[in-house]
Amino acid sequence: NSELKSMFRLGMYQAGQFKALTAKGMYDYFQAENISDMSMGWGDRLAGFNASKHGKYYYGTDPNTLTYNNYHRQHDFYDTGKEIDIHCEPSEDLTKPPKHSIDISFTSPPYFNREQYVDEDTQSFMRYVTIDSWLNDYMFKTIKQQWNYIKSGGVYAINISNILNKGEWVNICDPINEYLNTLDGSKYLGHMGMKIAKSPSIQLRKDVDCSLAEPIFVWQKE
């Protein structure tokens, strides 16, 4: 699908390395009407929802108090008439369920302690200082909760990557996919590469022609 591929290219370095067109491409490809996002970040996937062909309802949360009001301003600016149901609390603590069964849950959580956007005690890197606690008490709890809200035939998709921390690689992708594999009715559909530009923190050999990409893992609930 050439249109979908074009939406997965990130032509310049952006904060968070996420592109609203990627979200729009995912929503349109799966013809999703009801969408959830448990780490809203800078509102990129909210923008993709408002631009999508099929999106009608967006259920999301992010604990960052500095961005919450801006989500509403952003949505009002688009003036699409679509419904949003957003919250300002940690995803693992969110107890209010969505109003509708979810077609796709698509998110890009912070990569353990690599992304630190605000110094608030509700941030996952502040709450969970080891990778084991971050996975078990934050990621797995959030994934399980969202999985329960996804309708049969719906999709869970996550943009996540392993990270280099103090000179050692931290394995994030494998534990998350292994956990998803244990959930009732889970079926691995595959992964897509979201092309990213060179980060200021990445050094590449000048004689090597290569592209950088981050994976989006896609699972279906049967």
Where are these regions (language model features)?
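Class I S-adenosyl-L-methionine-dependent methyltransferase catalytic core
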Residues: 1-222
